[in-house]
Design a protein with these regions (language model features):
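RNase H-like (RuvC/DEDD) metal-dependent nuclease/polynucleotide-processing core
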Residues: 1-138
Length: 138
């Protein structure tokens, strides 16, 4: 692990800007997952791709009321065994709605994978040096 001060100094030299706390936290988690690969239980999922597959189209911005409504509707139709609205009401108040919806979309993809219905978005994904397919799953 590289100390925060060193990361900030290198980023400042290379880009003229520092690195956000969020980016540093995310990088730590990505490196942790990368160290565990290859592990067939770990999938690469992008919530927007999951929502696109659920809805059959690209949805409006997740930062807009229309986009939030469409995501809730898509989740409710795709996961009929879950009361999505009731589940969202149990989320901590400080968690942004778009983060909660993204977590649900990731859950939808994980369930599809567990049921053998998930699919990669690329016909021929690149394979990394460890033999892991570089592939988003929906």
């Amino acid at each position: 692990s590289v100390p925060n001060e060193e990361v900030q100094q290198i980023a400042q030299q290379l880009t003229g800007q520092g690195v956000s706390r969020q980016a540093l936290g995310l990088a730590t988690r990505v490196l942790d997952v990368d160290a565990r690969l290859p592990d067939p239980r770990i999938l690469e999922v992008h919530p927007e791709l999951s929502f696109q597959r659920m809805a059959g189209e690209v949805l409006p911005s997740k930062k807009s009321a229309r986009g939030v409504a469409r995501r809730i509707s898509s989740l409710a139709q795709a996961m009929t065994d879950v009361d999505v609205v009731a589940a969202l009401e149990t989320c901590p108040a400080d968690v942004p709605i778009d983060d909660s919806l993204d977590a649900f979309a990731t859950l939808w993809t994980a369930r599809r994978h567990a049921d053998g219905r998930s699919e990669g978005i690329l016909a021929s994904p690149e394979i990394d040096s460890r033999g892991t397919a570089m592939q988003m799953t929906v």
